[in-house]
């Protein structure tokens, strides 16, 4: 399971008519669990976003690029790193530039280059490209010249630093096509209170949504590795016969719904 903690430090100023200069400070901390789903943008349309929901890295490639857009009115520092599937250690890739300033309304590109690693030649291998957008603190030297906006003039600023981790899939030459085209090969079986998804393909099957008899299937990680089985607990009240609807995500972020009946 991949867990990415997003930490939001917010400082909110509140004024009363009789106490104009008094601030009420509220500290907000929220954690968001990410379990192998396809990419989410760093922010919404007013912030920083990535140019793709995943990166497919050909086995012998000399490097791939990914665009980074800043739709906000202020600059961000962009910091990038590639981690292994567990997200506990660095993967054998370098990102250039690893750290740069991205002004508001501008676009830049990062290049991901493999530097080693013993990856299998018969299946995909999963890594994570993690990109962090760091907003300027008040009076930060690197942010000089930032565009004036509502946030820039606020007496108490809200600092927001977000991590976005998207899949970086190393794809060998022997693995061709798109996972959505072979998703029908995934089989589902029910035994007792568990349901098992079996993936006989060389692709990571990325699942954006799954239900059993219309009830949400809770998946610890929302993907099924190549040549692997994933076991989940059945939703409450589901018996041996069930209809499974699941949505697979393809190379370009496209989604395709599949329906399977298990007797």
Model-derived features with residue positions:
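Terminal connector regions
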Residues: 117-175, 241-263
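Intrinsically disordered, low-complexity Pro/Gly/Ser/Thr-rich segments with frequent PxxP/GP/PP motifs
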Residues: 91-118, 215-241
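Short, hydrophobic/aromatic beta-strand segments
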Residues: 74-82, 141, 198, 205-210
């Amino acid at each position: 399971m991949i867990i990415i903690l997003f930490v939001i430090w917010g400082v909110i100023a509140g004024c009363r008519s009789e106490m104009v200069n008094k601030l009420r400070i509220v500290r907000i901390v929220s954690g968001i669990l990410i379990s192998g789903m396809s990419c989410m943008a760093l922010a919404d349309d007013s912030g920083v976003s990535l140019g793709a929901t995943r990166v497919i890295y050909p086995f012998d490639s000399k490097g791939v690029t990914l665009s980074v857009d800043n739709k906000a009115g202020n600059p961000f520092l962009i910091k990038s790193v590639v981690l292994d599937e567990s997200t506990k250690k660095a993967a054998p890739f370098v990102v250039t530039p690893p750290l740069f300033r991205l002004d508001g309304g501008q676009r830049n590109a990062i290049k991901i280059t493999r530097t080693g690693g013993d990856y299998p030649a018969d299946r995909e291998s999963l890594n994570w490209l993690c990109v962090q957008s760091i907003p300027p603190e008040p009076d930060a030297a690197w942010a000089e010249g930032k565009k004036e906006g509502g946030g820039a003039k606020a007496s108490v600023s809200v600092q927001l630093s977000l991590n976005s981790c998207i899949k970086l899939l190393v794809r060998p030459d022997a693995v061709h096509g798109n996972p959505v085209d072979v998703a029908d090969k995934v089989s589902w079986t029910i035994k007792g209170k568990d349901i098992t998804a079996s993936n006989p393909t060389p692709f990571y099957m990325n699942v954006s949504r799954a239900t059993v008899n219309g009830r949400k299937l809770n998946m610890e990680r929302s993907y099924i590795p190549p040549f692997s089985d994933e076991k989940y607990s059945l939703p409450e009240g589901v018996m041996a016969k069930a209809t499974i609807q699941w949505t697979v995500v393809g190379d370009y972020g496209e989604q395709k719904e599949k329906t399977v009946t298990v007797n």
